[in-house]
Amino acid sequence: VRTFIDSADKLKVLNARHVMARPSCMMRLSDGANYGLNEMRRRGFSSIYVVGDHMQLEGLITLESIIRALKENISLKDIMIRDIPRVTTETIISDILPIAAEAKYPIAVVNGEGELEGIVTKAMVLSSMI
């Protein structure tokens, strides 16, 4: 068994569930811009994930955008980035690698119902290869 495990290609065996971290910075649109800004400050993040009432991933809002929304009284819906990289919990690392190489933000990990389960950063993907 040890020989098999040592010889297995980690990139084709490990999936997002194995390397992801639980998302710690998230909000609902109904929480408002001040809440989002305070969460980012409190947790030390420059972006925040937006989820629906049942944790479905809606998108992401950056620190710069939320500050602009507050200054210019812009709706969070108008500044939310909807087209963000996402994978499922079962996506293997070899399929995540090219996404991570191009991603500006951590990759969202969703389950079969589209609910946010975790995030995967470039560092997490690279460290899984070691």
Q: What are these model-predicted stretches?
A:
Residues V1-R22, I130:
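C-terminal boundary and immediately downstream tail of ABC-type ATPase nucleotide-binding domains
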Residues T3-S7, L37, T62-S65:
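Short low-complexity stretches enriched in small and charged residues
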Residues K12-M26, T62, E72-I84:
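Bateman (tandem CBS) regulatory domains
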Residues L60-I61, V120:
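Short hydrophobic-aromatic micro-motifs
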Residues T3-D6, A21, R68, E72, ...:
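Phosphate-coordinating loops and pocket residues in cytosolic domains that bind phosphorylated ligands
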Residues M26-S46, V50-H54, I67-L70, P85-E113, ...:
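The conserved cystathionine-beta-synthase
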